[in-house]
Amino acid sequence: MSNSISFDFLIKVLRKVFLFQNLPDHLVKQLSESITTQEFEAGKAIIEKGDEGNAMFVIISGKVKIHDGNEVVAEINEGNFFGEMALLDGEPRSMSVTAIEHTVVAIINRNDFFNVLNDFPAISKNIITQLTRHLRAQNDVLIAQWRSREKELNDLVEKRTEELANKNSELMLVLDNLKLSQQQLVQQEKLASLGQLTAGIAHEIKNPLNFVNNFSQLSLELLEEFKELTDETERAEILTDLKNNLEKINNHGKRADSIVKNMLNHSRTRNDDKQLADLNKMSDEFLHLAYHGMFANNPDFSCYMKTNFAEKLPKVNVFSQDISRVLLNLFNNAMYAVNKRKKLGVMGYEPSVSVTTSTVNNCVLIEVEDNGTGIPETMKDKIFEPFFTTKPSGEGTGLGLSLSYDIITQSHKGKLSVESVVGQYTKFIIQIPV
Amino acid sequence: MKVLIVDDELDVEQLYRQRFRKEIKAGELEMMFAFSATDAMSVLAELAPMDIVLVLSDINMPGLTGFDLLKFTKEKYPHLNVVMVSAYGDADNMNRASSLGASGFLVKPIDFTLLKEKIFSI
């Protein structure tokens, strides 16, 4: 035993310890003789979790905390003991014990403890009672911890749920704004392409109207002539001419009508119904509209236009104004590309844009090919992305192909793909299921 | 008198033939038609003797334009009169036509009385 503590004092202390309450005097003495004492400053560890448990401790003076990391299970002071559990089960220490203030402990090592236990088995009851107390206390602490954690967790869940709900409504707002912006952008793109078209449309309407005017005026003159004539052969000739003229008037009137319809269709907000459409006719009309639109904005522009239309192309159910936008966009791009290449000024270059239709595997294919500048491999992935444009700022919205892609793949469950070799050609392939 | 009309609209043939019915019937005028600048070039090349007096060409045609044809004609057959026709009567087009040697510029819709005068003044 340590020198600083008297033997009698130690016996007094041990007597107070619940564990040794009814131990006979000689055994208390025997135990006291084998005991060593040790002092710990505040904050010093007496037991570390995981240590081998080969002794138990009785607090002679001071105060300690029993803890697992930062989690304090209990604080105990003089007259109490700790460390008996590891002693009994031989397992490593399950908790750490640290002095809270200056503390003196009596150390009872394993052999001495078991000797006492052998000589006086009655203290087993004390040990069990004590263990039960410890376990209960520990249990209570754990339950309390668990409850408070559960509450914390519930509060956290509630808080997070609220935050999420807030975020969600913010996002809904953002989404609404985005939808609005998207609609505006789509409208802008429509207007931009319509603006580009205006000149083409004017030209395309003016031409048939000129024919209508000319042929009707001529017919009036022919009628006047007819009235004067008596010769039957001459009269028959005039009647044939008149019939031809009326047919021309009718054809050109229809042509102008169809162009105006297309134009209105193109700018109108989409109606919800798909309609059966003749894609050959639409391709042809928009090819010419695009051509005249390009020409009107660019008097030097010209290109060969080739059409290879499949004769028995089935009509397809489509949102016709959407498809017309796709066609117009592809034709505009093609003509832009051939014009760009033409401006390089290579001798013998013949700008050409062609459109070919066919039926493959129950799908209608529209191929728009140009022999313009081509698309570099590195750009092929990007051209369908919104706002991607290679045109000088202000010339393109960067939405044409991305909208076209959405129209074909989403609204029509089709495919839009591209093949291109720089300096040779570009081919866009629209595939729409019949 | 022989005139070559160049336009990508096929119906111009019937229109012109009727407009100039009387003159054609009376043998005062003969009309030929070409529906692209390239067509017109081969028509001109195949003509012998070159008895055409006037080429009347649209400007805006797919492929080679009326300006290409004008340039070609003036280089190869400088004596030929070329009158340009366009739906766009802007100064740019007109100046360009006259600098390339066109002897006239008509804006669509064509005033046929004026065209007749032009043809018979040659």
Regions found by a protein language model. Name each.
Chain B
Residues D111, F120:
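Receiver (REC) domain switch/active-site region of two-component response regulators
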Residues D8, K108:
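A Lys-centered signature of the CheY-like receiver
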Residues M61:
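Receiver (REC) domain active-site loop signature in two-component systems and cognate sites
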Residues P49-L56:
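Active-site beta3 strand of CheY-like receiver
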